[in-house]
């Protein structure tokens, strides 16, 4: 086993592997070390019901269409196959729904059932923002967070009709109140902003940016399951000479005299070689875990050390319920039957007033009062035949809850099944309102709590899926900088953007490493802008 590398990446989440694949393709000798026995613990696809149905047990929404990574790494050649739904998302209520189509004109028609004025407003915004989506995503998402770029974020207000000095003091609630008249349109739009995870929609500034960036989101469905994304990334990484070691927990990272690093595996790692050397190290573990691994070395970067020791990972922790069903028909199909074709339906409050109350209750950590109020649902069999078998299908219901549970006895209550059953049963009761004969068609159900997810992904403290809260003091420049003040040390977890399936954090970290080592400008293939590869591929993609 070789000892010396150009770059060592600690952690094989999807963004860690994406970063490593870029660097390996750039000709850098790259090693990835992963504690677990498989990569990408939050991009798993499993047959959890033993029914032969692949279920995405965490990430279900694939944001890769908006990413440059798809094109740069040519993931199609490595097995990645994306399905594009004509109606990828939609918000469901008991008797109504609002479907978001890939064709803006059709979305406007759906909005017009609630408000002709709002339909016109939506089209006006889309017509202004669509030509600039590649630039917006490149500057606001696929670039390192920098104080000088904050003015660019505030300039996004022009697409919604607000000058920068006003936009930076607005939140999502205020903007949607000023843009739209229909409560349903406001509520559905707020849900879309919230799911995008570019900040807290209720906070000034970041909520405004979330509202603008929601218009840039493009999603798809990986055929066969989300696991095909990390599989294609690993194949790409290995094709370009990368080395991946699983069951390889990193104990510590030390600086070498004269430059470079030593990376040590724990004593119980099943490898005779426990030490590796590299010019650069990329930490793809959450900031508190990185802080522990770096030890005293972390103190040499005062910005990272100050942030990491107080890093908040308590606010965005998924509780996910899974339902094996004989049939799935929405109560609102009579309003618009296309909701049956939507792979990513959204539950977003009963009313606009309910949204305002629920958001505050969530901040108050009144968990039992907000059960099922705002949630992502995955009905992937609507577009992917492999997600159904013998007439059975799986519906996933994922909601992020605050983790502390101080009102209910503390975090240990997540291991009290009598308590968490209340949340799961709350999801069932809600779905019984939204889906015809839900209980009669329910064959089996199960769930993962935030603590269950933490056990499955040791870096995701409390089951936090984003490498730390993306709001308040941890928003944009408040996140970890990808370039450490320690020469040769980089971060791809806990940075901007959050670690999602657009692979933005891996892209940003790889860009920083490649630029600093002087290899990026030599890579002619490293050229795609966000969203553009998707537009090129669109004519040949499978569409449903």
Task: Please provide the spans of the model-predicted regions.
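Active-site/ligand-binding neighborhood in enzyme catalytic cores
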Residues: 130-240, 247, 456, 460-470
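Glycine-rich, aromatic-lined ligand/substrate-binding cores of catalytic
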Residues: 373, 382-425
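A conserved FAD-binding loop/helix module that cradles the flavin
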Residues: 494-514
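Flavin-binding catalytic cores
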Residues: 328, 366-368, 415-451
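Active-site-proximal substrate-binding core of FAD-dependent oxidoreductases
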Residues: 515-544
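Mid-domain catalytic core of redox enzymes
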Residues: 251-388
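N-terminal glycine-rich phosphate/pyrophosphate-binding loop and immediately adjacent elements
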Residues: 3-138, 468
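A glycine-rich dinucleotide-binding beta-alpha-beta segment and adjacent secondary-structure elements
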Residues: 182, 186-196, 372-378, 433-496
């Amino acid at each position: 086993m070789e000892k010396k590398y150009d770059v060592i990446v600690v952690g094989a989440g999807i963004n860690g592997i994406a970063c490593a694949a870029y660097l390996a393709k750039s000709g850098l000798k790259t090693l990835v070390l992963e504690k677990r026995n498989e990569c990408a613990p939050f991009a798993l696809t499993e047959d959890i019901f033993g029914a032969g149905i692949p279920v995405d047990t965490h990430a279900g929404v694939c944001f890769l269409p908006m990413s440059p990574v798809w094109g740069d790494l040519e993931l199609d050649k490595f097995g990645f196959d994306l399905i594009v739904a004509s109606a990828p998302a939609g918000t469901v209520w008991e008797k109504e729904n609002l479907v978001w189509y890939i064709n803006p004109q059709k979305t406007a028609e759906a909005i017009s059932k609630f408000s002709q004025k709002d339909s016109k407003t939506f089209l006006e915004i889309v017509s202004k923002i669509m030509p600039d989506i590649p630039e917006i995503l490149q500057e606001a998402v696929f670039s390192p967070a920098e104080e000088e770029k904050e003015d660019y974020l505030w300039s996004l207000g022009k697409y919604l009709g607000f000058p920068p000095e006003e936009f930076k003091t607005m939140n999502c609630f205020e903007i949607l109140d000023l843009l739209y008249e229909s409560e349903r349109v406001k509520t559905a739009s707020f849900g879309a902003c919230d799911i995008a995870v570019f900040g807290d929609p209720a906070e000034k500034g970041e909520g405004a940016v979330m509202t603008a960036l929601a218009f840039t989101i493009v999603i798809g469905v990986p055929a066969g399951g989300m696991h095909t994304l990390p599989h294609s990334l690993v194949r790409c990484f290995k094709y370009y000479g990368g080395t991946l070691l699983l069951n390889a927990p990193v104990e510590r990272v030390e600086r070498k005299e004269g430059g470079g690093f030593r990376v040590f595996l724990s004593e119980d790692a099943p490898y005779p070689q426990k030490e590796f050397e590299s010019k650069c190290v990329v930490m793809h573990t959450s900031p508190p875990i990185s802080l522990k691994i770096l030890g005293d070395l972390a103190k040499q970067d005062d910005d990272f050390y100050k942030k990491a020791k107080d890093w908040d990972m308590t606010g965005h922790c998924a509780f996910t319920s899974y339902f094996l069903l004989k049939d799935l028909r929405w109560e609102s199909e009579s309003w618009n039957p296309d909701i049956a074709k939507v792979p990513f339906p959204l539950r977003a409050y009963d009313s606009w007033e309910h949204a305002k109350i629920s958001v505050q209750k969530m901040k108050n950590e009144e968990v039992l009062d907000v059960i099922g109020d705002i949630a992502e649902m995955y009905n992937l069999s609507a577009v992917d035949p492999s997600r159904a078998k013998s007439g059975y299908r799986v519906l996933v219901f994922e909601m992020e809850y605050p983790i502390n549970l101080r009102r209910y006895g503390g975090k240990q209550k997540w291991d009290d099944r009598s308590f968490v059953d209340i949340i799961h049963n709350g999801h069932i009761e809600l779905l019984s309102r939204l889906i015809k004969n839900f209980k009669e068609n329910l064959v089996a159900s199960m769930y993962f709590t935030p603590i269950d997810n933490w056990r499955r992904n040791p870096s995701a403290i409390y089951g936090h899926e984003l490498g730390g809260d993306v709001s308040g003091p941890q928003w944009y420049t408040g996140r970890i900088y990808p370039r450490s003040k320690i020469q040769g040390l980089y971060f791809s977890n806990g940075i901007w953007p959050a670690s999602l399936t657009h692979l933005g954090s891996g892209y940003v970290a790889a860009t920083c490493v490649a630029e600093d080592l002087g290899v990026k400008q030599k890579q002619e293939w490293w050229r795609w802008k966000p969203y553009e590869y998707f537009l090129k591929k669109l004519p040949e993609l499978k569409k449903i």
